[in-house]
């Protein structure tokens, strides 16, 4: 394989040697923007912009600057969480510290993210796949030498080294050695909770899926119908999620050099069901540059609008997602939750009224044990309240989790009729209460309840009275649990919903003054995506507010005020952390105490979580330190200066830039 890829690269070099890039004319813009990387072998790399419906007209062409000497840009993609363009630089001739993650501005300026890493991607820089997994905010990197990595877009480091790319044992092409050079995920939008990874096996001109992605298992979809395996060809794949239609559309760029040193750059659409490629137009008008990589833009607002209604926190996959109660289609943020026991799944989420902090319940259904966590709403970091999981027989079904505001205890109920109280201070079981049972004489007295959600009224620290409402998923009815400790259920009415088999249903009640507003989230749609509803606690009737995001399966919610929760943060590693001046005009100084010698970096992000700058302060000695950031050229607004010691979060300060 090594000899083949080296030969392929040499052929590509020979075909383009001596060619210079031409200036490209601009054209009219249209709905969906895409980006590409073009290059010649004189070392000129350019970022081009075009519309998918008019690929022949590049609306912008700018040189790429800032790449480390010896590296080539081998991949670009848009980060779904922020809409930022990222790029991977790779030096095929180096064996260590040969790769660097960058953000790529539309001006063509590359900004390093973290430090260089070592990626064994082989010697063929034309066969490297690079794409964001939208469900976990990690970057998949694949290569023609069967390499399979994940990168962290926050630190630039290697998140995991995964299994080599190999066809599944039962696949019709199981005996073949793949030559993957392009990768792309479906459902590329913030808040995505389901995705599929597709690759182009360029060695055999076919579309494949990579399932499971981390195992590197390839599954044949079908032939492209066009060749991608010539030594004089370079292909790339990206998949655009259309928020209007709710559909995924796959695009492939294919650059082919001729023996006469002219280049044909073609855009194709790809049928994800069959693999068939259909020509969609020429890419640009130049015939002496090659189109290396393709990335469809993902639109995120330049600044988020004011919250409408309340701020809702939701558990979607392994992420903490936030959205507005009056506008759930706008996902404000999605952060990965870290620090949870690997044997547990988060099954409950609520705001503790006494502290305005976010709490969650981690549960191991096999061991029937649980841990109470606090969740940092800004970073997703979970901190265990009880160091050792407690025995909690909640079965294998759905679980309800909510704070009783009058006694500062957590009510935990299960579809198996379990009924517990937990102490939020130490995570212990405060009481094992009566099994959930419909009251004698109730309309459902003959039925066995299957409760999967619970919520108390008057969720404020000063509450002296409250009521507990629960949701029976088997009958889709709302019930009052009264008395709560006896587990007696009293039917109030049907919701008119039918949850899917996954039964991702939860409810929460927000209190403002003397008014309680109940919300319910359910995946009643046939596609499994969740919808937010308001809930009438008198009769169980639901009124849809809207679909959450572009389509997310949300299993738990917690409703907070518009300002959000206070959060429970880990102690900062940096002592005496301070920012001055603030507001900032020009140079901002961050002073802190360093407890031990460490490499210090500072990442600057905007209000949308986009990385706008990285300051590498180098190795610093223990003691007082200062790191400076120049805000010149940054738009006025809110920024977050995030310190890291030896790549570990050390503290954050918020800055307001005035110009």
Where are the language model's segments positioned?
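Sec/Tat signal peptide C-region and signal peptidase I cleavage site
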Residues: 26-31
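C-terminal tail/sorting-segment detector
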Residues: 614, 627-628, 633-659
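Structural motif
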Residues: 42-49, 94-103, 147-151, 205-211, ...
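Beta-propeller fold detector
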Residues: 58-68, 108-119, 158-171, 209-227, ...
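Short, glycine-anchored, charge-dense loop/turn motifs used at functional sites
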Residues: 604-612, 639
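Repeated scaffold domains used in trafficking and secretory/extracellular systems
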Residues: 69-77, 118-132, 168-188, 229-239, ...
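Short coil/turn segments that connect the beta-strands within blades of beta-propeller domains
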Residues: 32, 83, 135-137, 194-195, ...
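Residue-level detector of functionally pivotal "anchor" positions at catalytic/ligand-binding pockets or at interdomain
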Residues: 562-580, 593-595, 612
